[in-house]
């Protein structure tokens, strides 16, 4: 009997898929690296199992890192196993090559990296053929509840639908390699021009991030403190006393980043304002107008990390770990590793159901 191999991105997701499918697909037997039922085999990666590399003839050794050997642009990219997960890769490839497995389902995370993880595994398993040649479908999950998983299996996407995302993922991976290899070798050659070997790594994300840190550090070192003055006062009103602070209503931003509407640079200016208003009557007008404010967009990962850092002091890594746990273990969030701040249109019924559940919970 032919079977379908489902490849998830991590073991916990594979277990969730098995739990969700059991009521409709029957009992699954558990083995060391996979689950199997009458119709399905479910296994998982543990993140990236395969990485790209240049063909061996393009691998310039350290002693030849010079501008004369740049740029390195191989005509193709080969694949190699990630060292620490070789055994896992072998287990997944073994299931993919089974003769009774006639089609594959990519159940890796719903994003560019999830697409790449599966594609590289499938390509590696196919060897020189560049793939196994078996039909592929995509399980696209925004939520990890059992019903959401079953709905996902009822609405599998075709391989052709995912080709654009797969191309984007592969392009990003290969571009990162080209930037990293050529940039690192060029900067290392430049910094080693007077002798020795001074490894200077370059990366698409690493280098701009390092630049931000350096720029900030330079501003901190160049900062010179300046005294400024504020005018604070207590006001007596019919309803009682309240505190207030002077500000310049005509203030406009300038090239001076330290200038603010409530700051004065001269003590005599502050004293003059205080003397002019001390003990003087004044009229205060309070106005309120109705306004309509649109609700904020949903969080993407970056905005969630920024909010959690500002409110709770969480690092980006801590926020991601918490969000991932709420998504995978507690089924309380949609997929967190997203750069989108909107849900797909077909998610409207689920959103309504969630709001009804929250309303009934008394939260």
Regions found by a protein language model. Give the residues of each.
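Extended, highly charged linker/hinge segments and catalytic-adjacent loops that couple domains
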Residues: 162, 166-167, 176-178, 182, ...
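Flexible glycine-/small-residue-rich
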Residues: 8-9, 44-46, 108, 179, ...
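Long, highly charged, low-complexity internal segments
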Residues: 39-41, 49-82, 94, 197-328, ...
């Amino acid at each position: 009997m032919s079977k379908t191999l489902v490849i998830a991105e991590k073991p916990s997701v594979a277990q969730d898929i098995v739990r969700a499918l059991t009521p409709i697909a029957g009992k699954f037997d558990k083995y060391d690296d996979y689950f199997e039922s009458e119709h399905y085999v479910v296994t998982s990666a543990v993140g990236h199992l395969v990485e790209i590399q240049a063909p061996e003839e393009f691998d310039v050794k350290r002693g030849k890192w010079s501008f004369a050997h740049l740029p390195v642009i191989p005509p193709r990219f080969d694949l190699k196993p990630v060292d620490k997960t070789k055994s896992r890769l072998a287990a997944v490839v073994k299931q993919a090559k089974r003769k009774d497995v006639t089609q594959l389902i990519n159940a890796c995370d719903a994003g560019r990296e999830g697409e790449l993880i599966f594609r590289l595994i499938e390509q590696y398993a196919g060897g020189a053929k560049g793939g196994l040649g078996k039909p592929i479908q995509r399980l696209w999950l925004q939520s990890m509840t059992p019903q959401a998983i079953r709905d996902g299996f009822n609405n599998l996407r075709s391989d052709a639908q995912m080709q654009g995302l797969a191309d984007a993922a592969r392009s990003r991976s290969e571009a990162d390699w080209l930037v990293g290899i050529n940039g690192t070798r060029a900067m290392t050659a430049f910094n080693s021009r007077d002798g020795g070997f001074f490894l200077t790594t370059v990366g698409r994300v690493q280098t701009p991030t390092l630049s931000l840190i350096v720029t900030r550090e330079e501003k901190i070192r160049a900062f010179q403190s300046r005294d400024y003055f504020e005018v604070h006062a207590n006001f007596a009103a019919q309803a009682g006393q309240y505190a207030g602070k002077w500000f310049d209503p005509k203030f406009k931003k300038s090239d001076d980043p330290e200038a603010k509407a409530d700051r004065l640079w001269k003590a005599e200016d502050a004293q003059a304002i205080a003397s002019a208003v001390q003990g003087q009557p004044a009229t205060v007008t309070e106005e309120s107008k109705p306004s309509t404010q649109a609700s904020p967009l949903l969080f993407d990962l970056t905005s969630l990390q920024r909010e959690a850092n500002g409110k709770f002091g969480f690092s980006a890594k801590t926020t991601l770990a918490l969000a991932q746990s709420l998504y995978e273990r507690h089924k309380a969030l949609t997929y967190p590793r997203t750069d989108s701040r909107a849900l797909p249109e077909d998610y409207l019924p689920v959103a309504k159901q969630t709001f009804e559940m929250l309303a009934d919970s008394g939260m």
